[in-house]
Amino acid sequence: EKDYATAPSFWFNKNNKIIKNRNLPLMTPKEMDELPPLMYEDDEIIYHQGEGFKDITKDDYMSYQGLGYNTIWTIGCPLHCSFCGNSKFIEYDKNYRRLRYSSPRTIVNEIHRAISKQPYLSSVAFWDDSFMGMPYVELEKFCKLYKAEIKIPFAVYGVIPTYVREDKIAILLDAGMNRIRMGIQSGSENILEFYKRPTKLKRIKEATKILSKFKRYMMPPAYDIILENPVESTEDTRATLDMIYEMPRPFNLNIFALKVIPNTQLAKDIEGRGIDIPSIQD
């Protein structure tokens, strides 16, 4: 048996010693297509607090995901926002900014397999970081397959305003998309610049208007906003409120409090402005 602590692309704390193994090269789309199917109700085990590891059951799936199936199709993100964990992956390999994904047939087959094991599944959720960043031609292939073969609603929960286009939204809705979630984060150009987020306020507003055009065909879109940034001024907060006030209704807001992890670039940027970073235990 091989020592698990030698596994590439992982770090381990073993016997009070940090082991930093080499990183494997990023997989190509062809290699992603050649991966075996994801384990899903294939004799996995799950940890129950106070009980230890046990065989996973349908009840475990139901308590975690209800009647939905959660998946990720694309890997990578073209942005480099300092508040996001992707910034650390990009630090290790700049190619992580390139969007990589398996073929439309592969992701549809994955969903087929999940439904074959749990026929009661009634929705699919894509948790990609930049789903709309895929080329139109790939989305079109996916939509044709999904509409013809899967035939249950799906939601897209990782959308960057820069990549919101009417033609992409239209074909996704026709295939069964019923909800979308987009990251806005702030209505202040100053704070967006601080986060190293290149999406301009004008483009954010354009994206909300595009989504509003399709409000008859889907649930209200959800928009992410980050608060409790120690760098944010009263003027920055007011700019965010003004933007929210101007956005077309209806919509939902997901409000997040910024948690700064020590030794990250975000922490260094905040400390560079003379602001103390609380311990991660606080």
Label every PLM stretch briefly:
Residues 28-36, 41-45, 213-220, 247, ...:
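C-terminal accessory region of radical SAM enzymes
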Residues 1-29, 263:
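Glycine-rich beta-alpha loop elements in corrinoid/cobalamin-binding modules
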Residues 1-7, 173, 246, 277-282:
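Short, intrinsically disordered, charge-balanced linker/junction segments flanking boundaries
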Residues 23-25, 32, 82-83, 138-139, ...:
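Short aromatic-enriched loop/helix-cap "lid" or pocket-rim segments at secondary-structure transitions
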Residues 41-218, 227, 242:
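Radical SAM [4Fe-4S] cluster-binding motif and immediate context
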Residues 156, 223-225, 255:
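Structural beta-sheet core signal
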Residues 1, 171-179, 241-255:
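Structural recognition of alpha->loop->beta junctions
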Residues 79, 190-195, 227-235, 250-282:
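Flexible glycine/acidic-rich beta-alpha junction loops that bind and position SAM and/or redox cofactors
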